[in-house]
């Protein structure tokens, strides 16, 4: 999925295992046969703000009509971010490294609100915005989970060595956070940040957290492979959905249903036909598809573990016919970018590889976003594949490669795959055909 961000960090080395590997400098985009099977089954999804369950068709329709926010989980829900597959020692090791990094960077500690950052360190996922809830990780000393007493039921077992501190209405939970120079997580809401300011120097925790998670562990890479295969199975069914006379909204509803058959949750659905495809962040509309329309389909979901899929393909209603020069340039640009991926190369070099191909063909002004973004428990994270990001790629980093060309008022095209850096190149996690379909 296209987005806009910048940044840098100092990631650590990580091993990469399994999968289809493409050494740097020797990459070709394969044509993959249609998937032989697609899993199915009715999936119920919990609606934000309540206990009721809805069936797949009803939920997909709600997503397509924005009657339900598919991103919102019920408040105070708790689940383990990596199910039972992540060991206690893994989470304990992450917490210990966070403390070491705080000491190295001169921080008294970290304070993280509910979200992906807290989930990465503890396995906990919960929402509680009105009352202060946070993981407090001091550089030295006892790690604490601060919760309002009404949310005591969301706490984990004490197996991670985390002390649970509860507070009652009328008391000040902010006194439980150390004073001094504190790294604040991006998911801590502003109202709480403001109350933490007295007696503390608040700085972003991004650099510390990026160093922790930018290179994925083996288990994380396996989850990303699973997610990529799941979204590939959805893309395999897209051509049969794109028929003249159907609306983008109808197709988005179908895609939401299919994503839920393969994932726990729908993250996003983009169906941009004809001129709508020239807007990278178009979602869907009531525009009716016509024969020969180019259609950008960018879709993603998240697994029960919290890891995301994200893949874009461009289709033509009724079949492609002759491949346009624009699309061939885009195809070549993505291949050039993927060939560039290897340890030691900077993130901006991958962006430049795609951009040079597109610019040389005369389409440079129509490539209006970065080439990619990292992916994991967050849909968009480091490394951001963008000009100015001098972060060097290391084995275990996972990110999208998604150049696009957008002609205002006419059409757009984008190809997106998730790749993981290996010891000598990269592993391509998505394997749907990249030709115009």
Task: Place the predicted regions along the sequence by residue.
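Short intrinsically disordered, low-complexity coil segments enriched in acidic
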Residues: 1-8, 207
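Alpha-helix boundary/capping motif
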Residues: 6-7, 11-16, 21-23, 27, ...
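Phosphate-backbone recognition surface of nucleic-acid-processing proteins
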Residues: 43
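Active-site neighborhoods and metal-handling regions in enzymes and metal-associated proteins
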Residues: 78-437
């Amino acid at each position: 999925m296209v987005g806009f961000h910048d940044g840098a960090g100092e990631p650590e080395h990580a091993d990469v295992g399994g999968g289809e590997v493409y050494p740097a400098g020797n990459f070709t985009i394969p044509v993959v046969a249609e998937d032989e099977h697609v899993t199915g089954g009715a999936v119920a999804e919990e609606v934000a703000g309540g206990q009721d369950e809805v069936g797949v068709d009803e939920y997909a329709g709600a997503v397509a009509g924005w009657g339900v926010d598919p991103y919102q989980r019920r408040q105070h829900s708790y689940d383990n971010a990596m199910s039972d597959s992540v060991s206690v020692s893994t989470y304990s090791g992450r917490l210990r490294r966070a403390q070491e990094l705080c000491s190295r960077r001169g921080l008294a500690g970290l304070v993280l609100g509910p979200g992906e950052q807290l989930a990465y360190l503890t396995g906990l996922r919960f929402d509680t915005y009105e009352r202060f809830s946070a993981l407090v990780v001091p550089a030295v000393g006892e790690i604490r989970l601060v919760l309002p007493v009404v949310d005591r039921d969301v706490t984990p077992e004490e197996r991670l060595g985390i002390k649970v501190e509860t507070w009652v209405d009328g008391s000040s939970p902010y006194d439980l956070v150390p004073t001094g120079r504190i790294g604040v997580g991006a998911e801590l809401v502003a109202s709480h940040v403001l109350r933490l300011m007295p007696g503390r120097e608040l700085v972003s925790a991004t650099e510390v957290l990026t160093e922790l998670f930018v290179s994925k562990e083996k288990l994380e890479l396996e989850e990303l492979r699973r997610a990529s295969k799941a979204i590939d199975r959805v893309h395999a069914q897209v051509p049969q959905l794109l028929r003249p006379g159907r609306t983008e909204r109808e197709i988005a509803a179908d895609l939401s249903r299919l994503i839920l058959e393969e994932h726990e949750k729908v993250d996003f659905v983009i169906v941009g036909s004809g001129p709508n495809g020239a807007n990278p962040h178009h979602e869907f509309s009531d525009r009716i598809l016509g024969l020969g329309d180019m259609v950008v389909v960018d879709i993603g979901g998240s697994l029960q573990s919290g890891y995301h899929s994200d893949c874009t393909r461009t289709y033509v209603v009724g079949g492609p016919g002759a491949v346009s020069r624009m699309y061939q340039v885009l195809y070549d640009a993505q291949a050039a970018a993927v060939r560039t991926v290897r340890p030691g190369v900077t993130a901006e070099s991958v962006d430049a590889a795609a951009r040079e191909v597109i610019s040389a063909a005369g389409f440079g002004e129509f490539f209006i976003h970065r080439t990619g973004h990292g992916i994991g428990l967050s849909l968009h994270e480091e490394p951001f594949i963008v000009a100015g990001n001098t972060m060097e790629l290391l084995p275990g980093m996972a990110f999208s490669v998604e150049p696009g060309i957008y002609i205002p008022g006419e059409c757009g095209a984008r190809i997106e795959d998730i790749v993981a850096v290996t010891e000598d190149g990269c592993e391509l996690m998505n394997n749907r055909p990249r030709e115009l379909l």
